[in-house]
């Protein structure tokens, strides 16, 4: 039997080290839970128990494969697994000696729930450490005491925020919330897992006296009903329900269910609350939404695993040149500096454009600063990494990776790319042209970001006919460092996302020519699950981009037929380009959508017919992409559309089986 734990006894304190076999991270699976229980026997022989990690993470959470299996498992089996976790964590909480979690890395889901059951928690002062209860992102809720203990520890409003959003907190925020008792200084590059026993013992010995003194008080706090006045309770839960309903909507039941559990359990004892938590988990884990969101989780993990494998064989560039300081170039430069910590030389022929790019970066960082997400020193560091220039040679001669992000003009892109040293790695951010039509050498490939760069997680990494594996590896490595999810594909017009979106928008244009009401269509597709309908999407992307994209699609693929009387073309030629011009299908005041601007047909059909008509061309194009080997797996298409186009995650993806049963 493989061991998940080791232990050591130092000065009558038992140290239990989590060390998941054959894994880079620690995870809680059924075997780990069973083995953990054995380490709690004879606990009264010790002064305290300390939970530590032998890996760079503390505990990354429950094994999602086991959660996925619960969808088809009998209710009794799910009850058994959840109850086992409750039983063991209750044993930890009820010990007559203090318990301490030393959080040296990510503590997520069941890992954080273990820490919550302990008397105390300390975390390394490392801003890369994330602590979270992300279960609602998988369509479930924290089932090993998270909805019970966290509100009692940090307050209902803070717990609702963390549980219902699934967001992570860093060490300093965790300290301010009361989630941890102390933040332990560490040197750059160090991890608490590497402490010698003597150093570890000193850290623990300093913490234990206070935990011994407050043992009963702390346990009572987590086992007793929440202390909220009637007014506090009404305000907290009423406001939270309104906010969560608006954000999550009807298609994502987990956040509201988690809120309901927290609210209903506020007057219960610990054991009563845990029972309610278990019942809610068993309901959610059987929903199609949970199954779909778990499929998304695995799909993303597969994409990142592929990219990480390619990236592991190459070195990280030391600096990057970005050509073009427009919306995309400015966003790419900021993300490189902010997320990847890479020096950037941002080039543009316009001083005004460069100034605008830097101002935009500063505004973005000021927003993060005002919310407490970063410090002023961190904001200054990011800005110091971005250097601007109007000298193209400076931007192309010094960096060892160059990303071209100028407007979609073939001659301009070709000129800039061909002026780059072919011994350097060069990527184009084109959205409409084939990579091979711009250039064809081994160090050149595609790196297609989506707007806005700061928010959109997908990057299409495009291999042209001559692009080397090393180049693809470098582009993947940089994308991962930027916090993106790369999908590697072969070269074709539109790549994956735009090639799939254009048939959808072309079909929409044809429906307008037949007299359909675009406002009605927008509502129907939003009800389907899209964040916006096709008319609003055209306005946000820009009718000029839609026009050129449609033309490009029809030239590249002879089976594509455009609308004979195109509303999109009509608006484009009237310079009604959407949000950027103030009017398109709708009137716009900045980023606020107003009344309809374009003429609207009277025709309305049954929503299901409209949805199927618009989605069918997209699915047909997806089949062609697979047949052509642009990508090889349906999950690559599913993830591309979810992360690059906003396809509704609760449906599992464009080609997911649940897409039809959930609609």
What are the residue ranges of the model-derived segments?
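Conserved CoA-thioester-binding segment of acyl-CoA-metabolizing enzymes
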Residues: 1-52, 76, 83, 90
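N-terminal glycine-rich phosphate-binding loop for ADP-containing cofactors
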Residues: 2-8, 19-21, 67-74, 79-84, ...
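Helix N-cap at the beta1-alpha1 junction of Rossmann-like dinucleotide-binding domains, i.e.
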Residues: 56, 128-130, 350-352
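Short, active-site-adjacent cap segments at secondary-structure transitions
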Residues: 56-60, 108-109, 433-434
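Glycine-rich phosphate-binding loops of nucleotide-dependent enzymes
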Residues: 64
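Conserved catalytic cysteine-centered active-site region
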Residues: 88-101
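Gly/Ser-rich catalytic serine loop of serine hydrolases
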Residues: 101-111
């Amino acid at each position: 039997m493989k061991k998940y734990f080791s232990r050591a006894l130092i000065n009558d304190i038992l140290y239990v080290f989590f060390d998941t076999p054959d894994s880079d991270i620690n995870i809680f699976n059924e075997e780990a839970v069973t083995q953990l229980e054995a380490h709690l026997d004879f606990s009264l022989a010790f002064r305290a128990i300390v939970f530590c990690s032998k890996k760079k993470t503390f505990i990354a959470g429950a094994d999602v494969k086991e959660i996925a299996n619960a969808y088809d498992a009998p209710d009794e089996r799910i009850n058994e697994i959840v109850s086992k976790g409750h039983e063991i964590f209750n044993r930890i909480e009820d010990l007559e000696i203090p318990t301490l979690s030393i959080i040296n890395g990510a503590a997520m889901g069941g890992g954080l729930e273990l820490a919550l059951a302990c008397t105390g928690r300390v975390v390394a002062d490392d801003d890369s450490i994330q602590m979270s209860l992300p279960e609602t992102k998988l369509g479930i809720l924290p089932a090993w005491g998270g909805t019970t203990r966290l509100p009692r520890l940090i307050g209902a409003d803070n717990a609702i925020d963390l549980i219902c959003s699934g967001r992570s907190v860093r060490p300093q925020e965790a300290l301010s919330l009361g989630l941890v008792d102390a933040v332990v200084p560490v040197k750059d590059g160090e991890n608490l897992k590497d402490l010698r026993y003597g150093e570890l013992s000193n850290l623990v010995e300093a913490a234990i006296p206070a935990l011994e003194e407050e043992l009963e008080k702390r346990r009572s706090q987590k086992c007793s009903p929440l202390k909220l006045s009637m007014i506090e309770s009404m305000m907290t839960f009423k406001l939270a329900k309104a906010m969560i309903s608006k954000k999550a909507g009807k298609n994502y039941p987990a956040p509201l269910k988690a809120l309901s559990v927290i609210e209903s359990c506020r007057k219960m004892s610990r054991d009563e609350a845990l029972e309610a938590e278990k019942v809610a988990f068993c309901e959610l884990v059987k929903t199609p939404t949970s199954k779909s969101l778990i499929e998304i989780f695995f799909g993303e993990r597969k994409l990142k695993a592929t990219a990480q494998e390619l990236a592991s064989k190459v070195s990280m560039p030391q600096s990057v040149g970005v050509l073009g300081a427009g919306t995309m170039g400015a966003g790419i430069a900021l993300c490189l500096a902010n997320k990847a910590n890479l020096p950037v030389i941002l080039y543009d022929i316009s001083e005004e454009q460069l100034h605008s790019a830097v101002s935009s970066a500063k505004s973005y960082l000021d927003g993060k600063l005002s919310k407490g997400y970063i410090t002023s020193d961190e904001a200054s560091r990011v800005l110091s990494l971005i250097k601007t220039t109007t000298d193209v040679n400076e931007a192309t001669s010094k960096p060892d990776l160059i990303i071209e992000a100028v407007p979609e003009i073939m001659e301009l892109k070709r000129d800039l790319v061909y002026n780059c040293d072919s011994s350097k790695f060069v990527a184009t951010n084109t959205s409409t042209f084939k990579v091979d039509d711009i250039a064809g050498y081994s160090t050149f490939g595609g790196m297609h970001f989506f707007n806005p760069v700061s928010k959109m997680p997908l990057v299409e990494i495009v291999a042209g006919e001559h692009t080397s594996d090393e180049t693809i590896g470098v582009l993947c490595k940089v994308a991962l460092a930027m916090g993106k999810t790369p999908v590697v594909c072969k070269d074709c017009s539109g790549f994956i996302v735009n090639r799939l979106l254009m048939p959808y928008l072309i079909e929409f244009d044809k429906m307008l020519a037949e007299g359909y009401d675009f406002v009605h269509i927008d509502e129907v597709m939003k009800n389907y699950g899209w964040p916006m309908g096709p008319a609003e999407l055209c306005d946000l992307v820009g009718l000029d981009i839609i026009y050129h994209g449609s033309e490009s699609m029809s030239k590249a693929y002879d089976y594509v037929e455009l609308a004979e009387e195109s509303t999109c073309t009509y608006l484009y030629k009237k310079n009604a380009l959407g949000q950027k011009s103030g009017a398109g299908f709708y009137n716009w005041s900045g980023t606020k959508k107003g009344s309809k601007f374009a003429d609207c047909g009277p025709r309305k059909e049954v929503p299901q017919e409209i949805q199927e008509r618009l989605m069918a061309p997209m699915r047909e194009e997806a089949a062609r992409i697979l047949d052509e080997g642009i990508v090889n797996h349906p999950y690559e298409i599913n993830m591309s559309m979810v992360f690059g186009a906003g396809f509704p995650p609760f449906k599992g993806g464009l080609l997911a089986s649940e897409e039809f049963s959930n609609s």
